[in-house]
Amino acid sequence: MIRTMMNAKIHRARVTESNLNYVGSITIDSDILEAVDILPNEKVAIVNNNNGARFETYVIAGERGSGKICLNGAASRLVEVGDVVIIMTYAQLNEEEIQNHAPKVAVMNEDNVIIEMIHEKENTIVL
């Protein structure tokens, strides 16, 4: 059986920009992407903690060290600058792969700096 499991999470990032007139996507600081192994053009699910919106888009790599989290195109209507978001990817794994799967989670501070990396083996509560 193949199951869809969380693979990576950027937890509690803050939206730094919103650009309605861009073609679409989310731009994320390349350093953050590398820390959690998210690739440019990869599909991501986004949850806005401020208004409850949930949506999907794809990733564009942003400038390293910028802390940039910019929602582009139609997705920009679902956020405001300063909103706290959770950005996730998923992987389809078989039962054997699941046994050794440890998602990478980057916990962010208010400046979009990683303050903790969690390599989840089991369910972990992050406040």
From Swiss-Prot:
Its cofactor is pyruvate. GO terms for biological process: alanine biosynthetic process; pantothenate biosynthetic process. Its EC number is 4.1.1.11. The modification Pyruvic acid (Ser) is found at residue 25. Binds 1 pyruvoyl group covalently per subunit. It is an enzyme of class 4 (lyase). The keyword Cytoplasm applies. One of its GO terms (molecular function) is aspartate 1-decarboxylase activity. Pathway: Cofactor biosynthesis; (R)-pantothenate biosynthesis; beta-alanine from L-aspartate: step 1/1. Pfam families: Asp_decarbox (PF02261). Belongs to the PanD family. Catalyzes the pyruvoyl-dependent decarboxylation of aspartate to produce beta-alanine. This is Aspartate 1-decarboxylase. It comes from Staphylococcus aureus (strain MSSA476).
